[in-house]
Regions:
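Alpha-helical segment of the N-proximal tetratricopeptide repeat
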Residues: 16-52, 66
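Canonical positions in the second alpha-helix
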Residues: 46, 79-80, 113-114
Length: 127
């Protein structure tokens, strides 16, 4: 009797996966080069294919934060926090965004969560 081990256990490679990886690398490069309009477009297109990519959500939120579009930034930070709720960087930028919008209680709530995660975080005291 012949045993075919592993022959049928291979999952097919997603052809879109390689394109997504290339698009993500290009997105990171655009952000590093501070080409934010192009990065926003590419990142938004990327999220249509990979909607729950934590880093892309956070980075797009950060770009909107830099553009003083705090409400839009918060929406991306919230999506990012749905994936990684203990990300201090996301919570901190979200707190700053709420502060800029004069939503002090929401900023305080973010700071409290940061202190729960990292009691020695110095950025919270600056806020």
């Amino acid at each position: 009797m012949i045993v075919l081990v592993g022959l049928f256990s291979r999952t097919p490679k997603d052809p879109q996966s390689k394109k997504n990886d290339e698009q993500f690398k290009k997105f990171k490069k655009l952000v590093k080069e501070k080409k934010y309009p192009e990065a926003l477009k590419l990142g938004t297109d990327y999220l249509e294919k990979v909607p729950n990519h934590h880093d892309v959500l956070f980075t797009i939120g950060g770009i909107y934060y830099l553009k003083n579009k705090f409400r839009i930034a918060i929406s991306y930070f919230d999506k990012s926090l749905n994936i990684g709720s203990y990300d201090i960087d996301v919570l901190l930028l979200k707190a700053y965004s709420h502060q800029k919008l004069e939503e002090n209680q929401r900023a305080i709530d973010c700071c409290k969560k940061i202190q729960e995660i990292d009691p020695k975080n110095k950025s919270v005291s600056d806020l």
